[in-house]
Design a protein with these regions (language model features):
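Short, low-complexity, intrinsically disordered N-terminal modules
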Residues: 1-2
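Short, flexible helix-loop junctions that flank or precede catalytic/ligand sites
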Residues: 5-378
Length: 378
């Protein structure tokens, strides 16, 4: 918390402690409802007393700097990150709803877990060691994209020399210099805007560039340019799968630019890693991961703009670790990590996955695991 607000920060610390104790991911503060904590994908109230008008604003202002308060009062939005001694780092979004302040706080784990501990495909360790190209990690909000990206970057940090540059809004995981030098630039703190940071990134001589998120054409153009000029560029994108990610990228650009874009992607895209979190039998969440790799055939399809054939090609074979969501879910089910109901609930093709499971030699299915906390209250 900012030094000037340390006393006010005490108001919110008990909630942050609870989130850490319960391994929660998000805290929600909204007038008229009690604070709510999300843990292992389930959201439950903390206590029963609803927050009164002005309370959320007071909590929020207690962790914001004067400049952040001015930004919020001018734009009704503010993103920030805070660090609390003995607890860790938290990402905060403050916004207005129905004329009053509301706030969401996300817990950013202090230790970056390795790829294996996150139950992610080992091929991600190979991808992050690529010398150049574009790697996208896509998924819905809260699907673990940032954590996956951090695990990949930390693997490179531990195993290869070089310069890793991240441009984030805000910084989510803190890296320490290991084999690589890792420079982290936070928008609003270390640079005035994404645009300024992206324009100057090349002058900072990076080997790897991480862009926090691609939301529009300008950022996508820079990501492709970095890959074209011999850098490894990584970023996240909001999309449900590889096909949707490619469609979204194409829709960033006018029709007149599509042919060149297809060519650029066919030459520079290395992988699209799509992720969903599913509930394991033990109540903890596991990643189901779709991986699109730029094989020769996939490159040809992208160059022709034949995006919707890609899914069929992925289903026909898992070359070098390429896999669909349904193949990932099938594997998790076969390993006894998730129930049949959970696998089918997240399948792209429920009927196809159900048939594949029925034809397998799998035994009975256990009931889904619980949240691991009291059912009524935290």
């Amino acid at each position: 918390c900012p030094a000037a607000q340390e006393e006010n920060c005490m108001d919110i610390v008990p909630y942050l402690k609870l989130m850490v104790q319960k391994n929660g991911s998000d805290l929600f503060f909204s007038t008229g409802a009690p604070p709510n904590l999300k843990a292992e994908g389930e959201t439950r109230p903390v206590g029963t007393a609803p927050l009164q008008s002005g309370q959320v604003r007071k909590l929020a202002y207690g962790i914001m700097s004067d400049d952040q308060i001015k930004e919020f009062e001018a734009t009704y939005e503010c993103n920030l990150a805070i660090s609390v001694n003995a607890l860790g780092r938290f990402r905060v979004n403050v916004y207005r709803q129905r004329g009053d302040a509301a706030m969401v706080i996300r817990y950013i784990k202090g230790v970056i877990p390795p790829v294996e501990k996150l139950n992610l495909p080992i091929i991600l360790k190979d991808l992050i060691m690529e010398p150049r190209g574009l790697i996208l990690v896509v998924g819905a909000t809260g699907s673990g994209k940032s954590t996956t990206l951090a695990a990949m970057i930390e693997h490179r940090n531990q195993n290869r020399t070089g310069h890793i540059l991240t441009i984030e809004d805000p910084i989510e995981y803190l890296y320490t210099h290991k084999k690589s030098v890792v420079d982290q630039r936070e928008v609003g703190l270390d640079t005035l805007s994404y645009e300024n940071a992206l324009k100057n990134a090349m002058r900072e001589a990076p080997d790897v560039i991480q862009i926090g998120e691609i939301r529009e054409m300008f950022t996508m153009q820079h990501a492709i340019a970095y890959a074209e000029t011999g850098h490894l560029c990584l970023s996240t994108l909001h999309a449900n799968n590889a096909n949707q990610a490619l469609d979204r990228i194409i829709n960033f650009f006018p029709d007149s630019a599509h042919q060149q874009l297809y060519m650029d992607l066919s030459l520079n895209l290395r992988a699209v890693v799509s992720q969903r979190l599913v509930k394991g039998k033990n109540g903890q969440r596991l990643p189901a991961v779709e991986i699109l790799l730029l094989t020769t055939y996939i490159s040809e399809l992208i160059q022709k703009g034949d995006i919707h054939t890609i899914k069929e090609v992925m289903e026909q074979g898992n070359e070098r670790g390429m896999q669909t969501f349904d193949q990932s879910l099938y594997k998790l089910y076969q390993e006894g990590k998730i129930t049949l109901e959970e696998a089918l609930a997240h399948a792209d093709s429920r009927n196809n996955l159900s048939l594949k499971i029925r034809l397998s030699d799998t035994d009975g299915v256990a009931a889904p695991g619980g949240l691991g906390v009291a059912e009524d209250q935290f």
